[in-house]
């Protein structure tokens, strides 16, 4: 497993789409652990409000299995219960995954992440420095914006009315206009 990297805008691996979509809200640095080459792949962002109907949950798990079997690179915070289960589904395959925590990079790597990191199919990417240890609503909003800006496609499994996810979906639709 590699050591964490700090990526600056001058780095050739820097995703230039960030500045196009986020403008002044672009993080000045990105911190990464894992295979940075995953940033160059076509990516689908996964978002799901914390509470959603059962039918949506099952359909989203089926979609995650489809992405896994198709080898699609999925990027997400994997924070909501549905997103967490999708991560478990994705990690059971060989497809690439980018996890973006709403805080600094983790100090300890979860056991289920070690093998995907070692084989180069996992990237843990954060827009937050070491001073941001705890997830907050504000950090989650900024993280979700980062995830959306990095993605080529966006999959909103469920958007609760009035939620932060709804506001993000509206922002993303403005990028595609």
Per-range role (PLM):
Residues 49-56, 73-81:
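Short, glycine-rich nucleotide/cofactor-binding loops
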Residues 10, 33, 48-51, 79, ...:
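Structural motif
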Residues 45, 75, 96-100:
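A structural signal for isolated positions on well-ordered beta-strands in alpha/beta enzyme cores
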Residues 1-57:
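Short, positively charged patches
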Residues 4, 70-74:
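Short active-site oxyanion
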Residues 61-69, 81-176:
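Acidic/glycine-enriched connector segments
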């Amino acid at each position: 497993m590699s050591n964490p990297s700090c990526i600056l805008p001058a780095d050739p691996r820097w995703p230039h789409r960030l500045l196009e979509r986020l403008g002044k809200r672009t993080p000045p640095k990105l911190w990464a652990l894992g295979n940075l080459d995953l940033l160059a792949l076509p990516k689908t962002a996964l978002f799901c409000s914390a509470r959603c109907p059962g039918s949506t949950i099952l359909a989203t798990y089926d979609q995650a299995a489809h992405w896994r079997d198709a080898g699609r690179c999925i990027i997400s915070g994997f924070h909501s219960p549905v997103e967490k289960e999708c991560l478990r589904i994705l990690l059971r395959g060989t497809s690439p995954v980018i996890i973006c925590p709403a805080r600094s990079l983790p100090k300890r790597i979860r056991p289920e992440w070690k093998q995907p990191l070692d084989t180069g199919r996992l990237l843990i990417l954060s827009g937050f420095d070491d001073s941001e240890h705890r997830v907050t609503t504000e950090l989650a909003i900024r993280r979700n914006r980062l995830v959306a800006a990095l993605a080529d496609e966006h999959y909103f499994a469920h958007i609760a009315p009035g939620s932060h996810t709804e506001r993000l979906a509206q922002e993303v639709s403005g990028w595609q206009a």
